[in-house]
A protein has these predicted regions:
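Bacterial N-terminal signal peptides
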Residues: 7-14
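Catalytic-core regions of hydrolytic enzymes
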Residues: 22-34, 39-156
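Short glycine/proline- and acidic residue-enriched helix-loop micro-motifs
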Residues: 166-175
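Acidic, glycine-rich loop-and-strand cores that form catalytic or ligand-binding grooves
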Residues: 176-184
Length: 220
């Protein structure tokens, strides 16, 4: 049986309000936050179970998160990739590119893509945050969430030329934003822990959507 791993609004909200010096340092300089509700439209509903679709859950969380930022952090502009149930193309790569284009055009400082994963096992639970990079052996070994990542949303590294380009991009990304992205991701996970949710940790994945953006980014 396949079950959804539900992300709650209060957990998503926690990433907006980091406490202490670490949070202040990470939040400094963020003026535009781009929030992406993952999936959308009839062709890309995402994970689903008994009439509940990931695309709808993601949108509710994204809109709620945006309102919390706007109400509590008036100095930060919020930009959404979508505010309704929509897709940008019947081609998934073009759909992801369109979301990244919105973020790039907005001059975003931070890109947050919200997803709700699914698994065959009813015992699978918890929250995780993804940043751009290649999976570690430990991450691959612990991927018990079978449907966590749509393969079409990941970069295919089978082609040597593509792999070389992607690894060069990752190296540049880590030099520019890597430390920030990982620090933000760990802060997100730390705040999730306040609500007694199982911490699945920060993981690296070769995410197409993130590779198209020119800003600090993570998926949660």
């Amino acid at each position: 049986m396949r079950t959804l791993l539900f992300a709650t609004l209060v957990l998503a909200a926690s990433i907006c309000f980091p406490n202490g010096a670490a949070g202040d340092n990470i939040a400094r300089g963020v003026k535009v936050v781009v929030i992406d509700a993952g999936h959308g439209g009839p062709k890309f509903p995402g994970a689903h179970y008994r009439g509940v679709y990931e695309k709808d859950l993601n949108l509710k969380v994204a809109l709620r998160l945006g309102r919390l930022i706007e109400d509590n952090l008036p100095g930060i502009k919020v930009v959404y990739t979508r505010k309704t149930d929509k897709q940008f193309s019947d081609n998934l790569s073009l759909d992801l590119q369109a979301r990244a284009d919105i973020a790039n055009k907005a001059g975003g400082d931070l890109f947050i893509s919200i997803h709700t994963n699914a698994a065959r096992s009813a015992s699978a639970k918890g929250v995780e945050t993804l940043i751009m990079g290649e999976s570690t052996t430990e991450t691959r070994r612990n991927e018990d969430v079978l449907y966590a990542y749509n393969k079409e949303e990941l970069i295919d590294m089978a082609d040597a030329k593509t792999a070389a380009i992607v690894r060069a991009y990752i190296q540049n990304l880590q030099f520019t934003y890597g430390e920030y992205s990982e620090a933000m991701a760990r802060l997100v996970q730390k705040n999730y822990g306040k609500f007694s949710r199982q911490d699945r940790g920060v993981k690296r994945q070769l995410l197409k959507a993130v590779s198209y953006t020119h800003l600090r980014a993570h998926e949660t």
